[in-house]
């Protein structure tokens, strides 16, 4: 089936989803979760085939880890669907309302986008997360995953479609594009009028391609070159702990710190313990000459290092002589995802927050907190680094648009 034909089916399903009640959608989410657990063996068999092909094809260990499923991971994915069912339904929520002077009742209410396209890499969990959050928000979804996860995604979507249909909603609410070729992505990007919004999740090259070539409106999710700035007024022990957590708690996420900026006034106190802690965690430091004075293990940092989202056990480190210099560095190299300051100075914190342009700004906290679950939003589809339509963690409300409902009693203009 062509992408256009699948998009047309999704559009038909979206019309039914738009008027589905919360109880029906939540029942479908629970059915999806139960089916995943019940059919775990066939899911793992498909995943095993993908893993074998990936090893033979030379996929690196990090990609294989993201691709891999086991009984525990499938159970966790199912639990995430149950948690989505417990979240409030955004559809029909009144964003604002008033009675106009002429007596008209005006309400702005949330409505689904309609059809959401998701383009993503080798993460089978995204297949289920995206299907769940789109269904809960009343949207049909077209999924285009990586060819390296083709069998896993096919098995997962088959399970989800059966569960959705069994709960009384259209199976075409959840579809996996039949083709995993680059042409299928191009067709999806050109399906304006059938697909309402396209969300890319993955590396910089994937996101750039979709943003630059799509005629369907795109919500850009986050490449993250996140910084931690250790201010002159920082508590050194707190700063070391935050920097270490931001870099090492999980290496391959978009909210992982990739660069560390240190005010010259605290370099002597901060850098020796920080570099030792990073080295003990297996992190390679790429630093400026000032940083290299504190450790022979520091590699020279290039301009490319400061611009790189490593997603690995590497970090760039630079000494700066002022908050101004830190902000200038972030403006040059940051991606607008998450930036952090460690300081005991409220004026410095306020200035940093005001001047840094990012989806999230942390004060005395790890960059790793930029996450829908950590923010208390529940499920998220990604972290938007653009300013339209959404910014930051994208939960259920961010997968909606609004319309105005005006109720009168015969008023004429």
Swiss-Prot record:
Main location as per UniProt: cytoplasm
GO biological process entries: L-proline biosynthetic process
E.C. no: 1.2.1.41
InterPro entries xref list: Ald_DH/histidinol_DH, Ald_DH_C, Ald_DH_N, Aldehyde_DH_dom, G-glutamylP_reductase_CS, Glu-5-SA_DH, GPR_dom
GO cellular component, one term: cytoplasm
Keyword annotations from UniProtKB, A to Z: Amino-acid biosynthesis, Cytoplasm, NADP, Oxidoreductase, Proline biosynthesis
PROSITE patterns: PROA
Cysteine pairings via disulfide bonds: none
Subcellular localization, as worded in the UniProt entry: Cytoplasm
Biological pathway: Amino-acid biosynthesis; L-proline biosynthesis; L-glutamate 5-semialdehyde from L-glutamate: step 2/2
Reactions it catalyzes: L-glutamate 5-semialdehyde + phosphate + NADP(+) = L-glutamyl 5-phosphate + NADPH + H(+)
Amino-acid biosynthesis keyword on record: yes
Recorded GO MF terms: glutamate-5-semialdehyde dehydrogenase activity; NADP binding
Top enzyme category: oxidoreductase
Source organism, top-level taxon: Bacteria
Protein purpose: Catalyzes the NADPH-dependent reduction of L-glutamate 5-phosphate into L-glutamate 5-semialdehyde and phosphate. The product spontaneously undergoes cyclization to form 1-pyrroline-5-carboxylate.
UniProt similarity note: Belongs to the gamma-glutamyl phosphate reductase family.
Name of protein: Gamma-glutamyl phosphate reductase
């Amino acid at each position: 089936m062509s992408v256009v034909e699948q998009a047309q089916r999704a559009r038909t399903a979206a019309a039914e989803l738009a008027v589905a009640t919360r109880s029906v959608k939540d029942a479908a989410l629970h059915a999806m979760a139960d089916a995943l657990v019940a059919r775990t063996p066939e899911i793992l068999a498909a995943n095993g085939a993908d893993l074998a092909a990936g090893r033979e094809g030379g996929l690196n260990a990090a990609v294989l880890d993201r691709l891999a499923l086991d009984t525990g991971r499938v159970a966790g994915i199912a639990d995430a669907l149950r948690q989505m069912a417990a979240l409030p339904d955004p559809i029909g929520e009144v964003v604002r309302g008033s009675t106009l002077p002429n007596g008209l009742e005006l309400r702005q209410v949330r409505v689904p986008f309609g059809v959401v396209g998701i383009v993503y890499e080798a993460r089978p969990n995204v297949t289920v997360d995206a299907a769940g959050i789109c269904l809960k928000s009343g949207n049909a979804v077209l999924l285009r995953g990586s060819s390296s996860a083709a069998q896993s995604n096919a098995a997962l979507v088959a399970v989800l479609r059966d569960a959705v249909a069994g709960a009384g909603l259209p199976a075409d609410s959840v579809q996996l594009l039949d083709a995993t070729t680059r042409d299928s992505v191009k067709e999806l990007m050109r399906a304006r009028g059938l697909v309402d919004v396209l969300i890319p999740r993955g590396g910089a090259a994937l996101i750039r391609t979709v943003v630059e070539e799509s005629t369907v409106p795109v919500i850009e999710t986050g490449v993250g070159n996140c910084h931690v700035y250790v201010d002159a007024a920082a508590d050194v022990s707190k700063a070391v702990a935050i920097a270490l957590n931001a870099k090492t708690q999980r290496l391959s996420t978009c909210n992982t710190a990739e660069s560390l900026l240190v005010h010259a006034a605290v370099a002597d106190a901060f850098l020796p313990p920080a570099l030792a802690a990073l080295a003990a965690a297996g992190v390679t430091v790429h630093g400026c000459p000032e940083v290299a004075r504190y450790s022979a293990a520091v590699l020279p940092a290039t301009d490319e290092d400061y611009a790189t989202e490593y997603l690995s056990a590497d970090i760039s480190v630079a000494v700066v002589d002022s908050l101004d210099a830190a902000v200038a560095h972030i403006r040059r190299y940051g991606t607008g995802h998450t930036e952090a300051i460690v300081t005991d100075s409220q004026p410095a914190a306020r200035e940093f927050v005001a001047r840094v342009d990012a989806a999230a700004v942390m004060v005395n906290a790890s960059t790793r907190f930029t996450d829908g679950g950590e923010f208390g939003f529940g499920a998220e589809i990604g972290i938007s680094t653009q300013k339209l339509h959404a910014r930051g963690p994208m939960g259920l409300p961010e997968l909606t648009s609004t319309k105005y409902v005006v109720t009168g009693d015969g008023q004429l203009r």
